[in-house]
């Protein structure tokens, strides 16, 4: 497989057909465009398709250490991949792992303390940041309803409204599917 170099799964597993298509598309972009130097060292770990409201979004997972490099070319990459996959929205998310909460009373003497970056809260916040890139999350409000359910209102940078406003429904659906949390996105006027 030629695209095997672009999809490197954890544990050395073989990429499935859909991941193969994504890998092939990224490889073609590397061959044909001026993105070659930036894309040469980059690879993805997995990809999946998420359906919502009769539309589809493609979620591409990238290794966290290579994420900064991906973000340098992400706007171009997303535009090209969306063209190739007939208008499906494409989002890049860092491949992160959540470690379970340590149990009370159980001590494992050779176990390290769980780092903050592996907690559920940190991972979910990072997914949110990755999802809305290139916009920035400038604020967050969590509304707890009387029945105990939570609605997260995320305030995004007003300067990026024109570039990502059409994708807000996609972001909401993808975040709900990945984390199970309801979220709404707003572009508030900046406070002075």
From Swiss-Prot:
PROSITE patterns: RIBOSOMAL_S7E. One of its GO terms (biological process) is translation. It holds the Pfam family Ribosomal_S7e. One of its GO terms (cellular component) is small-subunit processome. GO terms for molecular function: structural constituent of ribosome. PANTHER family: 40S RIBOSOMAL PROTEIN S7, SMALL RIBOSOMAL SUBUNIT PROTEIN ES7. Coiled coil: none annotated. This is Small ribosomal subunit protein eS7. Belongs to the eukaryotic ribosomal protein eS7 family. Keywords: Ribonucleoprotein, Ribosomal protein.
